[in-house]
Amino acid sequence: MKKNILVVDDSALMRRVMCDIINSDSKFQATDYCRDGLEAYEKLKHTSYDGVVLDVNMPRMDGLQLLEKLQKEGIRANVVMVSTLTDSREADVTILAMERGAIDFVAKPTNIIEAKGEAFKRQLLGVLNAVLATQKAAESVRPAVKPAAKAPMMRKATGGKNKLVALACSTGGPKALQSVIPFLPKELDAPVVLVQHMPPGFTKSMADRLDDLSKIRVKEAEHGERLQKGCVYIAPGGKHLKVAKTADGNNSIVLDDATPAIGGLKPCANLMYDSLTGSSYDEIVCVCLLYTSPS
């Protein structure tokens, strides 16, 4: 049976393009469309969809306002945001949307040529396939993330080991990170390097928001900076992140612009993990994080 998708966008052209893309996959069917969040709210009150593709900026009720209303009223939805890369405000709103229940997002094309191109088609179908594969249909929208009132106590490690945590996230990663990073203790006895597969512009917004929510420091990684304990370094979108041993035996961040995307990903987690073999760390914990609904 095909998965029923609701498309919400104020542009008639974008609605048609996204519906055509969705219908081109035999697993999906663009069952309904709406011009704004208010129309979508009325539909979602009475109809369950397997997925919702939701624009950010719309008249009457925008995407974030719709998510807040769904959350408040406990209306079920699996939401993928569509957000403009060139608008820094939309990047911030998209990160907030993850707290309001959105599972992931895709970058909105800037013109009709891009909208009808293969890259956007692959991106939209790829995210829908991944999201619906890891989600129960019509998962309840979750409460907003709140900082931990008290971080769990950390036991002091013995032996003076030099440790590193390396995190990788893909589909649903931003949502999953909001359930993990805010609960890391400020005194974590290791730096954390993190690759989230996101386009440029969004990683800075995500780092800033996670820093606001967390006791541990969170920042977008910078080329050449030395890794410090108790800090999370997020790879910037559009750049590969590597860890390199310095001449004095410490470790620093290397941001790689030159290497092409690997499997369509830049940053690519595999490249980060490969670089760790040349670092000076005694213990490295590697984690791949994916958001899934509870059983």
Language model regions located:
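Conserved acid/base catalytic micro-environments in cytosolic active-site loops
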Residues: 2-6, 12-23, 33, 38-39, ...
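Acidic, metal-coordinating helix/loop segments flanking the phosphotransfer/catalytic sites
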Residues: 33-51
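Residue immediately C-terminal to the conserved phosphorylatable aspartate in receiver
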Residues: 44, 51, 56-57, 70
